[in-house]
From Swiss-Prot:
Present in all adult tissues examined with the highest levels in skeletal muscle, heart, pancreas and testis. Belongs to the adaptor complexes large subunit family. It is a peripheral membrane protein. The gene is AP3D1. AP-3 associates with the BLOC-1 complex. Adaptor protein complex 3 (AP-3) is a heterotetramer composed of two large adaptins (delta-type subunit AP3D1 and beta-type subunit AP3B1 or AP3B2), a medium adaptin (mu-type subunit AP3M1 or AP3M2) and a small adaptin (sigma-type subunit APS1 or AP3S2). Interacts with SLC30A2. Interacts with CLN3 (via dileucine motif); this interaction facilitates lysosomal targeting. HEAT repeats lie at residues 34-71, 77-114, 142-179, 180-216, 254-292, 299-336, 338-373, 375-409, 431-468, 497-535, 548-585. It comes from Homo sapiens. Keywords: Acetylation, Albinism, Coiled coil, Cytoplasm, Golgi apparatus, Hermansky-Pudlak syndrome, Membrane, Phosphoprotein, Protein transport, Repeat, Transport. Residues 639-675, 726-740, 795-839 have a biased composition (Basic and acidic residues). Part of the AP-3 complex, an adaptor-related complex which is not clathrin-associated. The complex is associated with the Golgi region as well as more peripheral structures. It facilitates the budding of vesicles from the Golgi membrane and may be directly involved in trafficking to lysosomes. Involved in process of CD8+ T-cell and NK cell degranulation. In concert with the BLOC-1 complex, AP-3 is required to target cargos into vesicles assembled at cell bodies for delivery into neurites and nerve terminals. It comes from the Eukaryota. This is AP-3 complex subunit delta-1. Residues 741-758, 840-853, 863-879 have a biased composition (Basic residues).
Length: 1153
């Protein structure tokens, strides 16, 4: 034995350790993969040895290889062996490897439970610490459930080192096993007051992370956190607590008022920028939520803005960005506080970082007023000229237009200035937003009538400029502006000073290089301009001038007829024929101007974006009907379609001759020159530039005219926007002087009347009058259509039915018939118990349709009251029709003689003889002074393993209940379906509010793994109760009971299928007997059908066979027999456990009879 140990020690001396492995990998760069595979083979041999030190060394090397990306899952069992070593140095290696490689899918992870429990209870704090650290990396739901109590015990350990680790790992345990949160929370709360600052920081971290998703659940800790915030000096802890308060403030308004003072003190005193930013951010959130409740908070806002200015002026780009981000939040509620720092925001436009420049641009959008609009745009225009890169320049262009056009041009006082800005923007080369500038030009010219004359003069200058035509090849380029220019000059041609000159500019040959859609607008507006000139010439008696304009049109329009664009061709051809006809009439001295101008009479106003939706569909028009009959499926797709006009000719591919090489081209050129020289009839050209082109090789001998595409710095005739800025300043100065004069006169009158005022009103944006009387044209809508009609909403919007005024008390006609629906129907006759069977098997969509129909009925009722039209008859007719259809359905289901003979068999339904007392499937869930909760659990065959829980919430208080949220602790067997992205400990919001005395229903889906046993889930309803005195946060705990009967669905079954099912021999059997039953057999069967979701297959005297089916497809068959004072139930089911539990539930129900 001693020799064996010595031999093992000698072998270990020659084993490779981690350093040797790393060194070897460095030395084998060329064949690294091969070397590592050899090392893995060696490691596998080492793991087979009994010596724990060799195994630990092997696992250490495997950990390094795992970091390089190699799979070591095959060594999971060996890692557990090293974890269980008694020596700490080996144990640490094992836990490190486990934390690197173990995950929920690791098969052997269940073997670690006892080892980890042993290490957690170890007297050595290092063994316990390494176990906690490793467990935090590979904790699974099973490990969390099994070890939760052990970790909770460690939260009270004597060593702060262990307490801190135990507190931190509890967060991972909560995530994997949410049921542990409630029992562990008291201890976690105690750790907030732990004497050790590390443990305290860990507790703050865990609770703040939990509260980040569900802040309302932690409102009760607000006093404790407030105490910590005012006493702690740890900046990291303060940041966490302040972030938590920022989330809690919207839920509890009273908390915000208390926070202002300590947060303000921290802002004044702290030098840490991170803490300063969080304080400012939270103060902003508090002031936004309390904007109506705190009348005097301007000092706090000013303090925040001043501190944010310090952040923005800092050289650190991250702090500068955060400062701008927080400033944008203040801007939404307190714009005037931010506007005073306009100079700083404009300086950020010069920053090297593009993200900071873009953030500053977003701020400028909200800082605009009538006073500073021109100044801000002027600054942005200078940045447009200096901007590097098309992306940022295009962003600047977009922002300039957004700033000026916001709120329907609210801040523009001089539209001539805005038109000049748009014209200056047309000089940008390479922009992709030409269509945006064009849209603005069109919009301003159409909406603002007073500016049309000036706009036309500027557009005519644009049409005459060469630089726009030069950029016609770029898609969405600046040439798009010509689209707007041509339309404006054509539509408002009466304002043109030189219409003939503009007409010639629009008919230039170079216009044909523009994109097709711009050429089409040119052609259409050329004829408008022609009609205007024609009218002017005829009124002046210049017949020759009118004929000359017509001749110009006839000469220039053919170039558009030859266009490759189909629309340009069509428009040009049509207009050319019209002009030729006019030319013939002019030759006969017939006046034609009036008729031509009548073609374009009237104004084209802008159409509202939603106008098309408002157009009513004519009666008799079915937009969903087929125009042509659809092709039958039998027709083969590969059938060749017949030619519509003539038989198609067989097209043969044209063989193009291969291109000649350079020698062949030179030989042909020389031969051609020789032939031309010897030809006496060939006219030789004189020496000219054309000669040079003929001497050039290839096809370049064709003469090409050199075009000067240089762009002038300033387009002639275009006014600069700076001139309008000066004119606007002078106009405002004169306006101010006139106001001062009027104010002095008023003051003198007041002195005479012995009246005094403490202060003079300051000039505001509203005092600045616009330069022109602006008449903004509104968008056109169809007759009797309003912009705010409810038709604007998407009819397929799933949230449309929830758009209800919840604060308004419910009228009698609007109350939901949730509980009344079943009570009234069941109280009339036992016949209503049968439709309950149908209701269980219906899809949830039916409820939505009913709700939508009720909404439509309400709208119709309102219209009926307004128009006083006799619509109630129609509604009554509809109800009678529904009742008739219901009656037909019942008659189909029930044989006509079923009620007469009690001894005859009754199939597929509940027996119907005696009247039953009213019953409801809704059971009480929980109640307090604020709310009452009742629920009904419904299964569906369409959704396997899922049940729908319908919860009715009734407000029993005088407060408005809002912000309601349902939290249910999932079990291993039942899980609540939550919205996508939510975790298991997140609550599900209730999609409505409850005014006093109102009830409503919410539905939730649960997924059930095994339905053979009943189970209970704990849940909490949290809500805010708001009344005149304020708002309080309340909660109501409940237990959701899933009985086995709730997993059954009433399913009809015929006697033949029922008999085959019993004969199959696949069903387990069980039975019960209940004594002391005096209820009639009819009522007894109705109770079983109603409460346990069975249907009657066949009944003979006091014996009946019944059937039901579970959501997972289990068949349940019953034979119910009634004696004099007892009832026996024999059952068969495909699952014996499910059957025994069902019979126990049935026994409890029958015992109450």
């Amino acid at each position: 034995m001693a020799l064996k140990m010595v031999k093992g020690s000698i072998d270990r001396m020659f084993d490779k350790n981690l350093q040797d492995l790393v060194r070897g990998i460095r030395n084998h760069k060329e064949d690294e993969a091969k070397y590592i595979s050899q090392c893995i083979d060696e490691i596998k041999q080492e793991l087979k040895q009994d010596n724990i030190a060799v195994k630990a060394n092997a696992v250490c090397k495997l950990t390094y290889l795992q970091m390089l990306g190699y799979d070591i899952s095959w060594a999971a069992f060996n890692i557990i062996e090293v974890m269980s070593a008694s020596k700490f140095t080996f144990k640490r290696i094992g836990y490190l490897a486990a934390s690197q490689s173990f995950h929920e899918g690791t098969d052997v992870i269940m073997l670690t439970t006892n080892q980890i429990r042993k290490d957690l209870s170890s007297p050595s704090q290092y063994d316990t610490g390494v176990a906690l650290t490793g467990l935090s990396c590979f904790v699974t739901p099973d490990l969390a459930r099994d070890l939760a109590n052990d970790i909770m015990t460690l939260m009270s350990h004597t060593k702060p080192y262990i307490r801190k680790k135990a507190v931190l790992i509890m967060y991972k345990v909560f995530l994997k096993y949410p049921e542990s949160l409630r029992p562990a929370f008291p201890r976690l709360k105690e750790k907030l007051e732990d004497p050790d600052p590390g443990v305290q920081s860990a507790a703050v971290n865990v609770i703040c992370e939990l509260a980040r998703r569900n802040p309302k659940n932690y409102l009760s800790l607000a006093p404790l956190f407030f105490k910590l915030m005012t006493s702690s000096t740890n900046n990291w802890v303060l940041i966490k607590i302040i972030k938590l308060f920022g989330a809690l403030t919207p839920l509890e308004p009273r908390l915000g008022k208390k926070l202002i003072e300590p947060l303000t003190n921290l802002i004044h005193s702290t030098s840490a920028m991170s803490l300063l930013y969080e304080c400012v951010n939270t103060v902003i959130a508090v002031l936004i939520s309390l904007s109506s409740g705190m009348p005097n908070h301007s000092a706090s806002i000013q303090l925040c803005v001043q501190k944010l200015r310090i952040l923005i002026e800092d050289s650190d780009q991250n702090l500068k960005y955060l400062g701008l981000l927080a400033m944008s939040k203040i801007l939404k509620t307190h714009p005037k506080s931010v506007q005073s720092h306009k100079d700083l925001i404009l300086q950020c436009l010069d920053d090297k970082d593009e993200s900071i420049r873009l953030r500053a641009l977003d701020l400028l959008y909200g800082m605009v007023s009538k006073k500073n609009l021109m100044e801000i745009v002027k600054k942005l225009m200078t940045h447009v000229d200096k901007a590097e890169g098309t992306t940022y320049r295009d962003e600047l262009l977009t922002k300039i237009i957004d700033i000026c056009s916001q709120s329907n041009y609210q801040y523009i006082t001089n539209f001539e200035w805005y038109i000049s800005i748009l014209v200056e923007l047309t000089r940008l080369e390479g922009t992709r937003h030409g269509h945006l500038i064009a849209a603005q030009m069109l919009d301003v010219a159409i909406r603002v009538k007073a500016i049309r004359k000036f706009a036309v003069s500027q557009m005519s200058a644009l049409l005459d400029s060469a630089h726009l035509l030069a950029s016609s090849t770029q898609r969405n380029g600046i040439c798009e502006v010509l689209y707007a220019a041509a339309w404006i000059c054509g539509e408002f041609s009466e304002h043109l000073q030189e219409p003939h000159h503009t007409l010639e500019a629009m008919l230039r040959p170079r216009v044909t290089t523009l994109p097709g859609h711009i050429q089409a607008v040119y052609v259409q507006n050329v004829v408008k301009l022609y009609a205007s000139i024609l009218q002017q010439k005829e009124q002046a008696g210049e017949a020759e001038g009118a004929q000359a304009v017509t001749q110009l049109m006839v000469d220039r329009l053919p170039q558009f007829v030859q266009s490759a664009d189909l629309e340009v061709q069509e428009r040009a051809s049509c207009i050319l024929q019209l002009v030729k006809h006019i030319q013939k009439l002019q030759a006969k001295d017939v006046p034609v101007a009036e008729e031509v101008s009548a073609l374009f009479a009237g104004e084209l106003n802008p159409v509202a974006p939603k106008a098309q939706k408002k157009v009513p569909v004519p009666e008799g028009l079915d937009l969903d009907a087929w125009i042509n009959e659809p092709l039958s499926d039998s027709e083969s797709e590969d059938e060749r379609p017949r030619a519509v006009f003539h038989e198609e000719e067989q097209r043969r591919p044209k063989h193009r001759p291969s291109e000649a090489d350079e020698e062949e081209l030179a030989r042909r050129r020389e031969a051609r020159k020789q032939e031309q020289a010897n030809n006496p009839f060939y006219i030789k050209s004189s020496p000219s530039p054309q000669k040079r082109y003929q001497d050039t090789p290839g096809v370049e001998h064709i003469p090409v005219v050199q075009i000067d595409l240089s762009v002038p710095l300033k387009v002639p005739g275009l006014p600069m926007s700076d001139q309008y800025v000066k004119l606007e300043e002078e106009r405002r100065h004169r306006q101010k002087l006139e106001k001062d004069k009027r104010r002095k006169k008023r003051k003198e009158k007041e002195k005479k009347g012995k009246r005094r005022h403490s202060s003079l009103p300051t000039e505001s944006d509203e005092d600045i009058a616009p330069a022109q009387q602006v008449d903004i044209v509104t968008e056109e809508m169809p007759e009797n259509a309003l912009p705010s009609d409810e038709d604007d909403k998407d009819p397929n919007d799933p949230y449309r039915a929830l758009d209800i005024d919840l604060d308004k008390p419910l009228a009698d006609s609007e109350k939901l018939p949730i509980q009344k629906h079943r009570n009234t129907e069941t109280s009339k006759s036992p016949e209503k118990d049968v439709p309950m069977v149908e209701k269980k098997s219906k899809k949830p969509k039916k409820k939505e349709k009913k709700h939508k129909e009720k909404e439509r009925d309400k709208e119709k009722k309102k219209e009926k009251e307004k128009k006083k039209s006799p619509k109630p008859k129609k509604k009554k007719h509809r109800k009678e029709k529904e009742e008739r259809t219901k009656g037909k359905k019942k008659s189909k289901k029930q044989p006509p003689g079923s009620e007469e003979a009690a001894g005859e068999p009754v199939q597929n339904g509940a027996p119907e003889e005696e009247q039953l007392p009213p019953e409801s499937s809704y059971s009480l869930l929980a109640e307090n002074s604020y709310v009452k909760m009742t629920c009904d659990i419904r299964g569906s065959l369409q959704e396997d393993s899922q049940v729908t829980v319908a919860i009715v919430l009734e407000n029993r208080s005088s407060s408005i209940l809002k912000g309601m949220e349902l939290s249910v602790l999932d079990s291993l067997n039942a899980r609540m379906a939550r919205p996508q992205g939510s975790s298991v400990h997140d609550g599900v919001p209730v999609p409505f509010q409850l005014p006093p005395g109102v009830s409503n229903e919410a539905q939730y889906v649960f997924t059930i793994q095994s339905i053979v046993m009943a189970q209970k889930l704990k849940g909490t309803l949290s809500f805010i109760a708001k009344n005149d005195e304020g708002a309080t946060h309340e909660k109501l705990d409940f237990r959701l009971h899933f009985s086995c009967s709730s997993y059954l669905i009433t399913t009809p079954c015929y006697s033949d299928a029922f008999a085959k099912l019993l004969e199959s021999g696949d069903l387990s059997m069980s039975s019960i007997k209940v004594d002391g039953i005096r209820m009639s057999f009819q009522n007894l069967l109705a109770k079983i059908c109603f409460h346990h979701h069975f249907s009657v297959v066949e009944r003979v005297d006091s014996c009946a066979s019944m059937y039901s089916r579970s959501i997972q497809g289990h068949h349940v068959c019953l034979l119910v027999k009634k004696g004099e004072n007892s009832v026996s139930v024999d059952g068969k089911c495909s699952d014996s456990t499910l059957l025994s539990n069902l019979l126990e539930e049935m026994k409890a129900t029958l015992a109450k009879c």
